[in-house]
Amino acid sequence: MMSAKDTVKVMVVMLAICFLARSDGKPIKKRSVSEIQLMHNLGKHLSSLERVEWLRKKLQDVHNFVALGASIVHRDGGSQRPRKKEDNVLVESHQKSLGEADKAAVDVLIKAKPQ
């Protein structure tokens, strides 16, 4: 059994802990601002690491593609241009004809002249 002095010491220590903790027996529900900021920074850091890892894998795939001796097609002028003149000309069967609704809209625009 504990003596009265030991019991008093334990009670004083428990009272000091409760007084200094100031939780009033309730669980602490709020997080401090610094803890929230730390969690936010950790999330941003993890997403940044994921992006870097994804980019590293893609660059490794490109490097492997070139290392395997795959032929790289070089373009003249860097843009895709039609090779024949006929590719530039619109075929009349593919041209859009004005429907009745389009003609009505054009008539309204012609009649509403700005002053």
UniProtKB/Swiss-Prot annotation:
It comes from the Eukaryota. Residues 75-98 are annotated as: Disordered. GO terms for molecular function: hormone activity; parathyroid hormone receptor binding; peptide hormone receptor binding; type 1 parathyroid hormone receptor binding. GO terms for cellular component: extracellular space. PANTHER family: PARATHYROID HORMONE (PTHR10541:SF2). Interacts with PTH1R (via N-terminal extracellular domain). Parathyroid hormone elevates calcium level by dissolving the salts in bone and preventing their renal excretion. Acts by binding to its receptor, PTH1R, activating G protein-coupled receptor signaling. Stimulates [1-14C]-2-deoxy-D-glucose (2DG) transport and glycogen synthesis in osteoblastic cells. This is Parathyroid hormone. It comes from Sus scrofa. The lineage of its organism: Eukaryota, Metazoa, Chordata, Craniata, Vertebrata.
